[in-house]
């Protein structure tokens, strides 16, 4: 296609404008200023323009003719180009035959093969997963079978009495002393049945070489049992009995009542204490009794026999008030728990001190108190109440000192005194030198 030079196009446009604008103007000498033959140099009027056109008309016409021919060629070339472009467009709409078209079937086959290979890979992966799941299932089935066997064994054990799983001696009696009288010589777990009891129950019997036997009613030694219990729990008992006497428990107020009131022969209660320096001390009380539930398990004893721990059950003068000793004595007090308040205090001693006990206002002895490691504790340690709530025996150690271990046990009075034990009538004064600071 021939291109029209840029100068030709510009000339064509200029001549076209001049031809259309001045083609009908006829020169008139009346309005022309003939000063110079050069166009418009001194007199640029229409007269000069007409003269210029007349002079160059022939050349302009020749150039115009040339340009018209050139435009015709351009037009023809443009038409041809348009036809070619339309043909190419139409050709592009149809699938082109190329080398790619020839290999399309192979590509499709390869793609199909690849898809089949992928499917096979997935299939084998599924097979592996299925095998793994089958192994897991089989393993779980074995575990379930073993667990069912264990459950069956446990169910068989639970159907048998507790004595089949612990070492319980065959002797029995109304208390541990009667068990020893029947020939028992080893300390351990025994069943006893007090005279008024409806059924026998398990106790720990501490049997001495002389044949005298203590029935243990309370044990503290490591803080493993929480003694913050309600009325029913203290009535029935809680904690754990063990053949080696290495567990904490409260035998139960109802059992203690049946034991201590079954005979005309009174019982002696012994309190055994151990501090955190491993020093030990005792306090013995004659004619210990625990009333019935109707009397809220009232605690009574006849007198303090002796013991270097001192008579904390008789109260103690802490120096806080002239009435301290009177309001901290325990003889004759009823049992109190946080849900059954029987103390002499306007508040609830059992609730603020976190235990069940024979509270007055409140205590000088508190053997069911909170277990504090190391012994010494403070008001901040005792919680919101700020009261002395540890395992306390105020006549031996200060009120802010909690014992390491405690045992409460009873024995018939007629067996008390064997092998050098303190005898009735030989009571000692309390040793007040070891009270500690209050």
Swiss-Prot record:
A cellular component term, taken from the record's GO annotations: fibrinogen complex
Keyword tags: Blood coagulation, Calcium, Coiled coil, Disulfide bond, Glycoprotein, Hemostasis, Metal-binding, Secreted, Signal
Intrachain S-S bonds: 176-205, 349-362
Predominant subcellular localization, coarse grouping: secreted
Short name of any one Pfam family annotated for the protein: Fib_alpha
InterPro entries in alphabetical order: FIB_ANG-like, Fibrinogen-like_C, Fibrinogen_a/b/g_C_1, Fibrinogen_a/b/g_C_dom, Fibrinogen_a/b/g_coil_dom, Fibrinogen_CS
PROSITE patterns assigned to the protein according to its UniProt record, in alphabetical order: FIBRINOGEN_C_1 (PS00514), FIBRINOGEN_C_2 (PS51406)
GO molecular function per UniProt: extracellular matrix structural constituent; metal ion binding; protein-macromolecule adaptor activity; signaling receptor binding
Domain Fibrinogen C-terminal, first and last residues per copy: 167-414
One annotated GO biological process: blood coagulation, common pathway
Signal peptide extent: 1-25
Binding residues annotated for Ca(2+), in chain numbering: 341, 343, 347
UniProt superkingdom: Eukaryota
Keyword Cell inner membrane: no
Glycosylation sites: 76
Processing after translation: Conversion of fibrinogen to fibrin is triggered by thrombin, which cleaves fibrinopeptides A and B from alpha and beta chains, and thus exposes the N-terminal polymerization sites responsible for the formation of the soft clot. The soft clot is converted into the hard clot by factor XIIIA which catalyzes the epsilon-(gamma-glutamyl)lysine cross-linking between gamma chains (stronger) and between alpha chains (weaker) of different monomers.
Subcellular compartments: Secreted
Record remark on domains: A long coiled coil structure formed by 3 polypeptide chains connects the central nodule to the C-terminal domains (distal nodules). The long C-terminal ends of the alpha chains fold back, contributing a fourth strand to the coiled coil structure.
Record note on quaternary structure: Heterohexamer; disulfide linked. Contains 2 sets of 3 non-identical chains (alpha, beta and gamma). The 2 heterotrimers are in head to head conformation with the N-termini in a small central domain.
Known role: Together with fibrinogen alpha (FGA) and fibrinogen beta (FGB), polymerizes to form an insoluble fibrin matrix. Has a major function in hemostasis as one of the primary components of blood clots.
Name of the protein in question: Fibrinogen gamma chain
Organism: Xenopus laevis (African clawed frog)
